[in-house]
A protein has these predicted regions:
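Active-site Asp-x-Gly
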Residues: 137, 144-149, 158, 187-190, ...
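Short helix/strand-capping connector loops at secondary-structure junctions
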Residues: 256-265
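Protein kinase-like catalytic domain
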Residues: 67, 115-119, 244, 267, ...
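ATP/Mg2+ or Mg2+-diphosphate-binding catalytic cores
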Residues: 265-286
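ATP-binding pocket architecture of kinase catalytic cores
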Residues: 23-26, 30-142, 146
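Conserved N-terminal boundary motif of the eukaryotic protein kinase catalytic domain
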Residues: 16-23
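An alpha-helical support segment within catalytic cores of ATP-dependent transferases
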Residues: 2-13, 119-190
Length: 286
């Protein structure tokens, strides 16, 4: 496989690349991560099963879109490819700062700047993509409440149902989510889609994001996600609200929006995430 990777990097970069250093990195999921270098040029390589090529191609498309539309530093996609057994994506190597940062206010203002661009009239995306390893359907909808209820919550509940797990009556709960979001006025914003601390950082103090799951939706989804697993520093939220204030009712909607990543984790990992999903559903049923 590594000969294929070397060849595709060479074709993409227009010079002969042959790695002399291959260092495996810690991975938060089933993807295998590597730092590849010839002593001069460095690249970040993700490797997975051949069937994951579509996921890597989606990631490349999402990164290119964020590069075009946002102020964030986003890694360039060098190439994607596959052999008989494996698929891979090669990204620009970006060295994340290790020290604690005081530039979270810039991260917040950059996200607000992205969300303020309302260039799409409908909710969805031009292709389905992935959140982690899970397929994320993005059929276009005119109404946000229908999109989120069906393409996000309903989809995740259906995936659980296919595993023999029913946390709630799916049809009833999807109808409830539609009703709860019915009166919420939304202008579609381009979302990162998986905006939590593990998918962002700083490079020489400049805010950077990666591993996106982009679509056009309610900007509050990105904010709610950022508060779920490891909330960001207050400076981030203060700066975001200064540039693009959140509207009344966000705290209630946050519970709805956070259910989506919780359900996704329940589908991927099961365990205590199933309990957490059940508890979140019960809160929304009250």
């Amino acid at each position: 496989m590594w000969n294929t990777v070397n060849e595709q990097i060479s074709q993409a970069m227009h010079f002969d690349f042959k790695h002399t250093i291959k260092r495996q990195l810690q991975s938060p999921n089933s993807d295998k991560l590597f730092q590849l270098s010839d002593g001069i040029h460095q690249y970040f390589v993700k490797v997975a099963h051949r069937s994951d090529l579509e996921r890597f191609e989606n990631e490349a498309h999402n990164l290119q879109l964020l590069t075009k539309e946002s102020l964030f530093m986003v890694p360039d996609c060098i190439t994607t490819g596959a052999n008989i057994e494996f698929s891979f994506i090669v990204l620009e190597w970006l060295e994340l700062d290790q020290q604690p940062h005081t530039n979270w206010h810039i991260m917040g203002s950059h996200l607000a700047s992205l969300h303020l661009k309302h260039r799409q009239a409908m909710f969805g995306f031009d292709q389905d993509n992935f959140i982690g390893p899970t397929t994320q359907p993005n059929r276009w909808h005119k109404k946000w409440n229908i999109f989120f209820a069906e393409e996000r919550i309903g989809w995740q509940l259906q995936l659980l149902h296919e595993k023999g797990i029913d946390l709630v009556d799916k049809d009833y709960f999807v109808a409830l989510i539609k009703d709860m979001l019915h009166s919420h006025t939304v202008k579609p914003s381009l979302l990162h889609g998986d905006f939590w601390r593990g998918n962002m950082g700083f490079i020489q103090s400049v805010p950077s994001v990666f591993d996106p799951s982009c679509y056009y939706g309610d900007r509050e989804v990105d904010i709610a996600m950022s508060e779920l697993f490891a909330p960001l520093p207050d400076a981030f939220y203060i700066a975001y609200n200064k540039h693009y204030p959140l509207t009344q009712g966000y705290e209630q909607r946050k519970l709805i929006y956070q259910l989506y990543p919780i359900l996704n984790h329940a589908n991927i990992f099961a365990g205590h995430y199933l309990t957490e999903a059940k508890q979140q559903i019960e809160l929304l049923l009250k």
